């Protein structure tokens, strides 16, 4: 799970009411949760505003569950899950979904793979049949595997190999971690993509695509007991599997700054900072989110104002916090003007970060960050898709969906002193990895 911000402004709630009225999140008493005998965790949030349903199937499998030689497998299943089962042909999942007026998508991260469906309430039985079918009887057809292997290799070239920002991020992340599997790229290393064996796929699927490793979320126009009965009918017969081994690797303390320098065909230099940061469930989480917001969210953020508008040292700033199961990274990334002196930009950036670490942010900056966070939370919660996503995030990453309904209050409680303490802990030069990409003909 990533919380990302660019330099584009977002609507800001009024300074008074938005952050004072955040404590009451409706819907807590409507949500129903149940765990099937096979371990499948099911959460249902009935919302009858429109006759539609959002389904999120969270699989606890990401690049953190991989190893050298099989990197990219979690992402590969994002492709394979749409390519046939014992009962259905490749592409039939999409065709049946679209025939009902529905749509679907999926994404993979360092920690999870998530499958998303949006459909009319009348299609609930069919969609649960489709979803359970591909968990129970996914097909492993060699020709399909080879075809999708080529698709993933092309995707990697587009997103990483031929994308300077993506390539630099991959190299920075691989340098930031020395022991933990977060060092692996989600899409996989090129040599691994070309060498997965069918046995690797089958072993990974059996281990992680088991009901006791899934969390199924339904939000929308459903009656909970009827929906639970349908889930039981379709998913109940799927046997649980032996739980995956717990990951034992723990990233050692980083003792000094690490640096990555790439020379590539490029119009403009790029600069990235990746600081070691807490896991999603860490109590400091709200303060980390607000810190990132004050730094890079919107045109009035600290770094946009200082580096883009005032000093003209960057054309764009952004950032994200990888909120994972384990401690991850807080990223800052800057796109620089042509011909920039990267060292000059770094000095200016370090000056701003040192000031925040030493003195915190102003009261106005913190209020603004809280308002923007509250506005974003309520915008997402206004849709059934947002409800399904947030319910899943809190159940999977925070261990309890009930924490969703206390989230706005937790953000509101963050004090300037707490934010400054978190800033001083995270924005430590000894715990960061710096990535620089310069044009090939640059003297940097």
Go through each PLM region and give its residues.
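His/Glu-based metal-binding/catalytic segments typifying zinc-dependent metallopeptidases
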Residues: 47, 56-58, 157, 174, ...
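Short acidic/His-enriched helical or mixed secondary-structure segments at domain edges of catalytic enzymes
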Residues: 153-171, 250-269, 306-316, 325-327, ...
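Scaffold signal of the M16-like zinc-metallopeptidase fold and its non-catalytic homologs
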Residues: 2-15, 83-85, 127, 159-210, ...
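C-terminal regions of mature proteins
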Residues: 2-24, 31, 215-217, 334-335, ...
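Buried hydrophobic packing residues in well-ordered domains
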Residues: 39, 57, 75, 97, ...
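An aromatic/glycine/proline-enriched structural segment found at the starts
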Residues: 2-21, 178, 186, 210-211, ...
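M16/MPP (pitrilysin/insulinase) zinc-metallopeptidase core fold and M16-derived inactive scaffolds
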Residues: 49, 54-118, 184-185, 297-313, ...
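M16/insulysin-pitrilysin zinc metalloprotease superfamily fold
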Residues: 84-87, 118-151, 299, 318, ...
């Amino acid at each position: 799970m990533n919380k990302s911000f660019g330099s584009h402004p977002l609507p800001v709630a009024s300074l008074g009411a938005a952050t004072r009225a955040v404590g009451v999140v409706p819907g807590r008493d409507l949500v129903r949760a149940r765990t099937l005998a096979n371990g499948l965790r099911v959460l249902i949030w009935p919302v009858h505003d429109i006759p539609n349903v959002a389904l999120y199937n969270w699989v606890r499998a990401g690049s953190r569950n991989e190893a050298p030689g099989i990197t990219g497998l979690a992402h590969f299943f994002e492709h394979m899950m749409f390519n046939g089962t014992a009962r259905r042909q490749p592409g039939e999942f999409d065709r049946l979904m679209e025939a009902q007026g529905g749509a679907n998508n999926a994404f993979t991260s360092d920690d999870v793979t998530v499958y998303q469906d949006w459909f009319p309430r009348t299609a609930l039985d069919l969609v649960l049949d489709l979803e359970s079918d591909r968990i129970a009887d996914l097909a492993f057809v060699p020709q399909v595997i080879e075809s999708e292997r080529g698709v993933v290799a092309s995707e990697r070239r587009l997103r990483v190999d031929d994308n300077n920002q993506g390539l630099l991020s991959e190299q920075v992340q691989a340098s930031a971690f020395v022991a933990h599997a977060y060092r692996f790229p989600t899409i996989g290393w090129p040599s691994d993509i070309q060498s997965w064996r069918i046995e690797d796929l089958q072993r990974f699927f059996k281990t992680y695509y088991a009901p006791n490793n899934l969390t199924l979320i339904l939000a929308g126009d459903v009656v909970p007991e009827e929906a639970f009965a349908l889930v039981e009918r379709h998913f109940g017969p799927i046997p649980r599997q032996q739980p995956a081994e717990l990951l034992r690797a723990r990233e050692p303390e980083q003792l000094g700054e690490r640096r990555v320098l790439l020379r590539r065909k490029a119009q403009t230099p790029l600069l990235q900072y990746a600081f070691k940061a807490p896991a999603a469930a860490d109590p400091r989480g709200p303060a980390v989110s607000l810190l990132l917001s004050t730094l890079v969210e919107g045109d009035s953020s600290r770094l946009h104002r200082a580096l883009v508008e005032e000093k003209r040292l960057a054309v764009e700033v952004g950032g994200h916090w990888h909120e994972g199961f384990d401690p991850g990274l807080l990223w800052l990334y800057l796109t620089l003007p042509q011909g920039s002196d990267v060292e000059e930009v770094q000095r200016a950036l370090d000056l701003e970060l040192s000031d925040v670490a030493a003195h915190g942010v102003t009261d106005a900056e913190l209020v603004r960050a809280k308002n923007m966070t509250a506005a974003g939370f309520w915008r997402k919660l206004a849709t059934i898709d947002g409800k399904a996503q947030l319910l899943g995030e809190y159940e999977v990453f925070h261990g309890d969906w009930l924490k969703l309904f206390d989230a706005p209050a937790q953000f509101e409680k963050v004090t300037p002193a707490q934010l400054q303490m978190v800033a001083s802990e995270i924005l430590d030069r000894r715990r960061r990895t710096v990535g620089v990409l310069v044009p090939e003909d640059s003297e940097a």
